[in-house]
Amino acid sequence: YSFRAGQFARLGMELEPGAAPVIRGYSIASAPEAPTLEFFITAVKDGQLSPKITALEPGQSVLLDGPAEGSLTPDRIPGGSTLWLLATGSGLSPFASMLRSEAFWAAWKDVVLVLSVRQIEEAVLARELVAALPLERRPKLIVTTTRETDPARFGDLTGRIPTLIASGALEAAAERQITPEESRVLLCGN
């Protein structure tokens, strides 16, 4: 399956025998050169498809519909010295694909990955992702929590990304400035 880092694929399942499959777009989390496709999918409580996909067992099938789509790809970003990847929740997926990609690291050396989650447990995938990367390819990871009330469970920061940018707290935590001349910023999530 051919795709560029940052793109999404349309996955589907036939939920009732003989019915048309229900299809949704999910960002690909694996690198383009990986032998398998990986997705970070959050089961939406009353969702039509995501609970079914996340309940699949090994060996069960899912429909992969059509070619990969999407324009949140690093080849569309003009050069700069620092790339900021700002994600909320499963918006981490396209950035995981980029960070795992050989071609991505040929273009970017200084990367800041910011993940905003409700509770700190939701940051496990990001921490595992960064830890699995070679040392020379690890972005600066900043986790911010929005619904933790116990200070012992806060992330690196607490609050929503726009508020942290406006206050200067995000730049302080990253030890870098966001400037139009040198920074490029990608956003993904809700």
Locate each region found by the language model.
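Ferredoxin-reductase
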Residues: 1-60, 146-147
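Ser/Thr-glycine-rich phosphate-binding loops at phosphate-binding pockets of nucleotides
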Residues: 88-93
